[in-house]
From Swiss-Prot:
InterPro entries: DEAD/DEAH_box_helicase_dom, Helicase_ATP-bd, Helicase_C-like, P-loop_NTPase, RNA-helicase_DEAD-box_CS, SPB4-like_CTE. Transmembrane segments: none annotated. It catalyses: ATP + H2O = ADP + phosphate + H(+). CDD domains: DEADc_DDX55, SF2_C_DEAD. Keywords: ATP-binding, Helicase, Hydrolase, Nucleotide-binding, RNA-binding. The gene is RH18. This is DEAD-box ATP-dependent RNA helicase 18. Residues 47-226 form the Helicase ATP-binding domain. A motif (Q motif) lies at residues 16-44. It comes from Arabidopsis thaliana (Mouse-ear cress).
Amino acid sequence: MDSSANINKALTETRFSDLEPPLSGDIIEALNQSDFEFCTPVQAATIPLLCSYKDVAVDAATGSGKTLAFVVPLVEILRRSTSFPPKPHQVMGVIISPTRELSTQIYNVAQPFVSTLANVNSVLLVGGREVKADMKIIEEEGCNVLIGTPGRLSDIMERMEILDFRNLEILILDEADRLLEMGFQRQVNYIISRLPKQRRTGLFSATQTEGVEELAKAGLRNPVRVEVRAKSKSESSQQLTNSKTPSGLHLEYMECEADKKSSQLVDLLIKNSDKKLIVFFMTCASVDYWGLVLSKIPALKSISLIPIHGDMKQNARDKALASFTKASSGALLCTDVAARGLDIPGIDYVVQYDPPQDPNMFNHRAGRTARLGRQGRAIVFLLPKEEAYVEFMRIRRVPLEERKCSEDASDVIPIIRSAAMKDRAVMEKGLKAFVSFVRAYKEHHCSFIFRWKDLEIGKLAMGYGLLYLPSMSEVKQHRLSSEGFTPVEGVKFEEIKFKDKYREKQRQQNLQVRKEKRQEEKKEKGKRKRVDASASNDPKKASRKLTGKQRQTIQTAEDEEVMDRDYKLMIKVKKGLIKEDEYERLTGDDDLF
């Protein structure tokens, strides 16, 4: 079946050329060149409203084509503006989104349409690069459409008085719920305060929280609410009409022990080697570790494994994202940095190796596939004691179908451990990933399901392929189960070397420095002991060598000892064991009289 025809049929039969008020010829041509003929439901509902100068609050499923739903009307509104064409530093449109990646994506989508406007320049403003570089571009080239993250946008607006917002036509707040969740309310409020009230505003959000409602009240004027829901056949039969999962998405869960998870993941990657997957982990350290160790498994050598997370430098994230976007197959290993907003084409499978801390992120993760009417699959790995999550998600109108563990999955733990014994980088990253996961698990929003005290760290450590269990205060204090872990025998872990010769050289130098420091401390300790021994024979000399605080501490201890002795003697007097004159002699009280 022709995929494009299937997409169009699954979404809507409304063409962009059929919309009212009609779109300009330049926009229709730009849409056709990008193979956009038919609208998605959110596009068909939203574009006419914004083009009719209405404020909109849009609540749509993830993967619904929201970007074009505001980019197209933004360009149309600018074209029809009385201020068109604008002066070089006259800002007519602002688009705010929560992450650098999403802002970059919006900018790239918008470029073909903005370029249809003569003398209009759009500028991308995100963190990760020098703010002075952005200021120089704006000063020299001008800017009429600002697209970026709240932090960098507000920073530029505060610094550059040259920017003129008096004739601004339209403001777009994309992923508004995420903007608030990430703590950008102050910056968003500042940006809105700098803009004229006589403008069009579009607020796009996957969830309608109280914060989003408040933002809508403050930033929108009599908005039209647009709600677009995707509904699958299985959901219809269960009357789950409010589900936000895309209609072509097949959701599954796999229940397996912690020491079997890594083997099941490798088996899944092998069986889908010709597909494009996203694998979600809970922490940045986990992404780093699995990105390194999975590449050591011979059966995965032919599969492109690309890690990306929020702690990576911006240019590294951009490079990784571009590489995966261009690839026809492979796996993107990531944290929730890629769970929302990133519209990576052609994702076939989403794997949630670790369930998200925030259950609201589940759909955003799974929604990276089955976008724009395509078919897709998503699976979440669960431990046996986490099975209640299935019922929890069903109540939230996200039904999960069970998938059994693969019986022919090869045990990869020996391979992982072998890699750790050959390269200290693997061993150390594994320990760091394990510790970060255990601590992150404690912060689960659904702690009644993901019970930290029930975490079997022995099996978990085996699943990570650790050589030994790290010393953790959390483990010692709460006695988490270490059953199921088999430590590696006959290996001196301190002697495992880095494969990277430079890192190993640095390690050896650091070891030598620490060794010399310990020897020096040992010498100093010996000197102190000799001094203390000498001082003990000469109390006055010892007293002179002590600081005031040390003398006070010693005096307090001596006083407490005397008080304790006197109290015990007093008890003996009361019991008639000794006479009062004996008490006075022993305590020295008779010296006072």
